[in-house]
């Protein structure tokens, strides 16, 4: 729930007349009900309507009194976004472009795997991290999303899956934006979707990825939550990583690795390193050896990413044979590594591409 204190801490949060009902954690809903003269147990009924029955209107919550429904309508909205574009790939990947209440647009992607359906969610409108290979940063950062706007992305995808009696089985927070720059709303989102009364998606089926906001890595390590953790690394030395990710100038590789070691010591959980391969930049055998040396003491996995071409960027794809050689060298050196399967190559698949193509309000 967005409080005055939260708004003071997070200047990039929106200032809507009514906040999303999906922004409330279960405990916050209970507290709000009591503060408004209602019975605490109504929280369970409301969450059932929101996350199990997935109604679109507060008036559809028929086991609530008319008085309570009116109070809810006076204080909250259920409409946080509308679908503007829905692109479906030959491989079943679906990319959604949503328009928010203030006209900004965000992307969400449904990816189908043998093991289930994964949703990639966005945490910010735009991004200020400035990765030189990413379309998401082209328009800069406009604002942070409320927790409810992040929840609504998953719910909208789930409602689409309801038509074929499927369910969202995994969530990855790897869409537009840097999750750790919207930390409190991201944490509320995680608690809502993980809650037994919410979407009840297991913590081990949710992954958060960061570009390396070091103070927040320490905070995340201290959270009592079993969420999977990934780091966008892309370079094993400061020269290459700073070229690809300017944030490395503020949080260099040495300091980043110190934070990652702290995280693993505190949580005893495996870490995933996202490593995009860029032709002629970071994709040679010597780069694989340098990467292996950097992470050899960690319980980790390397996810090698054949990068999607972004028209506004100049990077080229690494040839397939070089990708396989890179993976083979990591494995020879004892590093667990896999190559990410390319999905949605025919539908503006790179993060931020669809939004960049359709963006109107943001570019005024």
UniProtKB/Swiss-Prot annotation:
GO CC terms in record: cytoplasm
Biological source species: Staphylococcus saprophyticus subsp. saprophyticus (strain ATCC 15305 / DSM 20229 / NCIMB 8711 / NCTC 7292 / S-41)
Chief localization: cytoplasm
Lineage: Bacteria, Bacillati, Bacillota, Bacilli, Bacillales
Family the entry assigns: Belongs to the radical SAM superfamily. RlmN family.
Enzyme class: transferase
Residue stretches making up the Radical SAM core domain: 113-346
InterPro entries xrefs: Aldolase_TIM (IPR013785), Methyltransferase_A (IPR040072), RlmN_N (IPR048641), RNA_MTrfase_RlmN (IPR027492), rRNA_lsu_MTrfase_RlmN/Cfr (IPR004383), rSAM (IPR007197)
Gene3D superfamilies: 1.10.150.530, Aldolase class I
Cofactor remark from the record: Binds 1 [4Fe-4S] cluster. The cluster is coordinated with 3 cysteines and an exchangeable S-adenosyl-L-methionine.
Binding-site residues, [4Fe-4S] cluster: 127, 131, 134
Highest taxon, organism lineage: Bacteria
Residues spanning the membrane: none
Residues that coordinate or bind S-adenosyl-L-methionine: 177-178, 209, 232-234, 308
UniProt keyword annotation of Iron-sulfur present: yes
Catalytic reaction equation(s): adenosine(2503) in 23S rRNA + 2 reduced [2Fe-2S]-[ferredoxin] + 2 S-adenosyl-L-methionine = 2-methyladenosine(2503) in 23S rRNA + 5'-deoxyadenosine + L-methionine + 2 oxidized [2Fe-2S]-[ferredoxin] + S-adenosyl-L-homocysteine; adenosine(37) in tRNA + 2 reduced [2Fe-2S]-[ferredoxin] + 2 S-adenosyl-L-methionine = 2-methyladenosine(37) in tRNA + 5'-deoxyadenosine + L-methionine + 2 oxidized [2Fe-2S]-[ferredoxin] + S-adenosyl-L-homocysteine
Subcellular location: Cytoplasm
Annotated catalytic residues: 107 (proton acceptor), 351 (s-methylcysteine intermediate)
Disulfide bonds: 120-351
Function: Specifically methylates position 2 of adenine 2503 in 23S rRNA and position 2 of adenine 37 in tRNAs. Confers resistance to some classes of antibiotics.
GO biological-process terms attached to the record: response to antibiotic; rRNA base methylation; tRNA methylation
Annotated protein name in UniProt: Probable dual-specificity RNA methyltransferase RlmN
Enzyme Commission number(s): 2.1.1.192
UniProt keywords, alphabetically: 4Fe-4S, Antibiotic resistance, Cytoplasm, Disulfide bond, Iron, Iron-sulfur, Metal-binding, Methyltransferase, rRNA processing, S-adenosyl-L-methionine, Transferase, tRNA processing
Names of required cofactors: [4Fe-4S] cluster
